[in-house]
């Protein structure tokens, strides 16, 4: 069975000796042992660089009871297992002005087994299931974000940095310099940047980086979010990956370009098949369409996520696939051959990428195992169809709220298989509490509408 690890763009496979030499040559003082919790929040323990041997020998412990969704206090001893290929000197200095480096870590139990609640370990488990069928998955994520101004006291506002639109340039696009700084920083960290541009909404931006294997892609999304926030802060701005921070304009998505490979070849491509899409591709599409409602709580995990998933703002709402039609949930871009892929348009950038990518992979595998045929592609603008027309074409819709998404997820064996027993249980518990907190909160909208009238 393959031991999956982070794949560097330069193909470099580090040794412990090389890492220690880099640390010494660059006067690195601290090593950040980084991981994510079940909600995808980045956590880290910082250790002096003199502890690098101990870190690389998997000897540094953490208290799992202090991490939401991990361990109870009586079984809380856990260990960092760094992925040596993820070593990276951070291009920005902290407030202390010293150099730091980062290692992305798996979390292991005290008995030396992978912790079933570690999102990164869980993704590796699902990757091993795909490997048994001969498949590996590549994903190219397209994460959007907003840049907001800060007030004189440094507090975050919802005032966008500019009022530019899609593909605009300066002087309307005031974020151009910030984006350039982010791109240069990401390139310094080993990212292959393909494009950057202003998005549709005021203050909204997108930076696209090259696809990678599913584990490396999840690592990259996590690193991307940290880097974007760090560089924005340097410009006295706040970057947010909140899906819908402002009412009435487009929200931020994270379209995922998905492809499966087998024996080194793109398994979605068949030169002689209809649309040049292989049977494997069609089964994967069938699996995604069948199960997408069951994993939407994972790919769109916030109460706020569902403010984005509404008609009228270019967000996918309806369950259909197409060859070019951007009103469909799944789209097959024009390129074929090694570039054949399916674009899933519903995920948002607030998701835990390790869990979201595991869920996407599991839906594809279920489609392949059970030979789930997709319906015919829909090439008309689904947003313009009446509800009667959609019903006639059997075009369903995504869940309209986190509560509805959790109801679908709770009954889904595919979602349970994707997350594993521990994460599934902890995720459901956490998200139900989040919904209850929102459901019982008295909002300003209610006060404005009801306080004087009633």
Where are these regions (language model features)?
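Glycine-rich, acidic/polar active-site loops that bind/position phosphate-bearing ligands
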Residues: 2-454
């Amino acid at each position: 069975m393959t031991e999956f690890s982070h794949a560097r763009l330069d193909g470099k496979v580090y040794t412990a000796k090389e890492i220690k030499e880099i640390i010494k040559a660059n006067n690195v003082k601290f090593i950040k042992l980084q991981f994510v919790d079940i909600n995808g929040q980045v956590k880290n323990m910082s250790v002096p660089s003199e502890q690098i041997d101990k870190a690389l020998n998997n000897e540094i412990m953490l208290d799992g009871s202090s991490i939401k969704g991990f361990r109870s206090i009586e079984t809380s001893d856990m260990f960092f297992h760094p992925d040596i290929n993820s070593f990276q000197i951070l291009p920005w200095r902290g407030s202390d002005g010293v150099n730091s480096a980062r290692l992305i870590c798996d979390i292991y139990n005290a008995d030396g087994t992978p912790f079933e609640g570690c999102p990164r370990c869980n993704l590796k488990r699902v990757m091993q299931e795909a490997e048994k069928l001969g498949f590996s998955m590549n994903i190219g994520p397209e994460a959007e974000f907003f840049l907001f101004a800060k007030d004189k006291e440094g507090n975050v506002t919802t005032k966008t940095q500019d009022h530019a639109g899609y593909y605009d340039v300066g002087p309307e696009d005031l974020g151009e310099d910030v984006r350039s700084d982010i791109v240069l920083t990401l390139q310094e960290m080993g990212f292959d940047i393909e494009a950057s541009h202003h998005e549709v909404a005021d203050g909204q931006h997108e930076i696209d980086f090259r696809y990678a294997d599913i584990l490396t892609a999840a690592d990259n999304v996590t690193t991307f979010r940290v880097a974007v926030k760090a560089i924005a802060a340097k410009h006295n701005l706040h970057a947010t990956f909140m899906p819908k921070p402002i009412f009435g304009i487009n929200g931020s998505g994270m379209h995922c370009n998905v492809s499966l490979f087998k024996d080194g070849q793109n398994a979605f491509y068949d030169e002689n098949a209809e649309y040049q899409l292989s049977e494997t591709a069609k089964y994967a599409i069938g699996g995604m369409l069948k199960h997408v409602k069951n994993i939407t709580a994972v790919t769109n995990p916030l109460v706020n996520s569902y403010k984005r998933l509404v008609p009228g703002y270019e967000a996918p709402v309806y369950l259909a696939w197409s060859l070019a039609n951007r009103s469909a949930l799944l789209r097959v871009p024009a390129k074929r051959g090694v570039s054949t892929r399916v674009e899933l348009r519903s995920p948002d950038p607030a998701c835990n990428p390790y869990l979201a990518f595991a869920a996407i992979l599991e839906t594809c595998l279920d489609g392949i195992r059970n030979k789930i045929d997709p319906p015919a592609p829909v090439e008309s603008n689904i947003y313009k169809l009446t509800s009667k027309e959609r019903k006639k074409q059997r075009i369903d819709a995504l869940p309209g709220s986190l509560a509805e998404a959790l109801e679908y997820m709770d009954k889904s064996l595919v979602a349970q298989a994707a997350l594993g027993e521990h994460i599934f249980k902890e995720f459901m518990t956490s998200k139900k509490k989040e919904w209850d907190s929102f459901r019982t909160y008295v909002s300003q909208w209610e006060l404005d509408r009801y306080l004087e009238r009633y």
